[in-house]
């Protein structure tokens, strides 16, 4: 993907932080801008813990295209920056290869 531009992130911070597991009702109430994968509403990112979870589970997400992974990576980068999380990865294909 070197030289290719990543899509613009769609993730936006929400007015609240949800610590811990989200209930189905809470997850259903989120807008698509809260998710790493907006179309499939996978990997909600409402706080730093959920952003780290999205990073850790990235390769486990099924039923998405490489273009959707590009967007999800952009969304994760934006959310990580917002919550003060440092990312070593510069491309989604690196997830799972640099973490100890």
Where are the language model's segments positioned?
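A charge-rich, low-complexity, intrinsically flexible signal that marks solvent-exposed coils, linkers
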Residues: 2-100
